Amino acid sequence: MSQTKTAKVRVTLFFILVGGVLAMVAVVTDHWAVLSPHLEHHNETCEAAHFGLWRICTARVAVHNKDKSCEHVTPSGEKNCSYFRHFNPGESSEIFEFTTQKEYSISAAAIAIFSLGFIIVGSICAFLSFGNKRDYLLRPASMFYAFAGLCLIVSVEVMRQSVKRMIDSEDTVWIEHYYSWSFACACAAFILLFLGGLFLLLFSLPRMPQNPWESCMDAEPEH
């Protein structure tokens, strides 16, 4: 591989590494969405909640605005966190009135785990490609990274649909919501992993013949 392509590959792998770190942060943190109920009286305590793929945390925040809304209130202070019941059946998750979409939650978590698995396998291929004449391993690595990005954006969409159904449900007290920084990390990771995988595939392809009478086999090998 030429020095120019080597430099491009290294820069691309750096951005992919950043995407992998963001994906890991998004999966293990609990700030995908923030939920809050509607207040019936002034000067009430707002029970805001934030949750991720695995657990949910609640905190009571004093609200003094006049619109009786906890919208965009950030949970702070002492928090009460609990894993979703379908991930930890032995733990009581009835710490507050909350309705989850079990199928959506399990699907989003499972797809996110697949994404991390693709990142790990792609990283192994990329690491092995630095050996002598193993540039061909960059091609499967690029595909694994692209698949990881696709899995991550699917997980994001499943989570978004879960929040939407939760808010629209008649059995929940939560009427306000917004997506937080873990959700943003997942979206940024998708962009870096998917585009990084495509660029890595492009840079790892063999040099095309420069003249019509050349074939791929006759072209000068790259070092």
Swiss-Prot record:
It is a multi-pass membrane protein. Keywords: Calcium, Calcium channel, Calcium transport, Cell membrane, Disulfide bond, Glycoprotein, Ion channel, Ion transport, Membrane, Transmembrane, Transmembrane helix, Transport, Voltage-gated channel. Disruption phenotype: No visible phenotype. Glycans are attached at N43, N80. Residues 1-10, 131-135, 206-223 are cytoplasmic. It holds the Pfam family Claudin_2. Residues 30-109, 157-180 are extracellular. The keyword Membrane applies. This is Voltage-dependent calcium channel gamma-1 subunit. Regulatory subunit of the voltage-gated calcium channel that gives rise to L-type calcium currents in skeletal muscle. Regulates channel inactivation kinetics. The chain crosses the membrane at residues 11-29, 110-130, 136-156, 181-205.
